[in-house]
């Protein structure tokens, strides 16, 4: 599971997810990618599940990049606890994903393989996504 090694503060405000992604919205490393179409928090478990689904499908071939990192702690209080007495303890980590953000990238495999691998990863995500490919250079 992905999580930061250390952070400046243990707890964070929840914040708001307004607008589209201005960074990380273009393919940087691979030729194919999985792009988010909705805003959401993606947990480190969901990121890992998507990565596993893709690696299992492509097996030895291809390289996969994970373009999102869970750097936001989500706190939870113990069950059946009375209100008050401060904020809960950090329970898990999430990545804040806005529409347009590229979540995974892939290279070194045919488009059909990449498309199917991304489809399997998309099933693990709590949001709608789309497959994006780098435009082909014509010689």
Curated annotation (Swiss-Prot):
Compositionally biased tracts (Basic residues): 1-21
Signal peptide start-end: none
SUPFAM superfamilies per record: Ribosomal protein L16p/L10e (SSF54686)
Span list, region Disordered: 1-23
One family name in Pfam for this protein: Ribosomal_L16
Subunit structure: Part of the 50S ribosomal subunit.
Name of this chain's protein: Large ribosomal subunit protein uL16
């Amino acid at each position: 599971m992905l999580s930061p090694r250390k952070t400046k503060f243990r707890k964070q405000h929840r914040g708001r997810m307004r607008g589209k992604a201005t960074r990380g919205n273009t393919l940087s490393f691979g030729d194919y990618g999985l792009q988010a179409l909705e805003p959401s928090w993606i947990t480190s478990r969901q990121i890992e599940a998507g990565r596993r689904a893709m690696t299992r499908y492509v097996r030895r071939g291809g390289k996969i990049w994970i373009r999102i990192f869970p750097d936001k702690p989500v706190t939870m209080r113990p069950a059946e606890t009375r209100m008050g007495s401060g904020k809960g303890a950090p329970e898990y980590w999430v990545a804040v994903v806005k529409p347009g953000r590229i979540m995974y990238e892939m290279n070194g495999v045919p488009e059909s393989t990449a498309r199917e691998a991304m489809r399997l990863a998309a099933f693990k995500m709590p949001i709608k996504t789309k497959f994006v490919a780098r435009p082909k250079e014509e010689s």
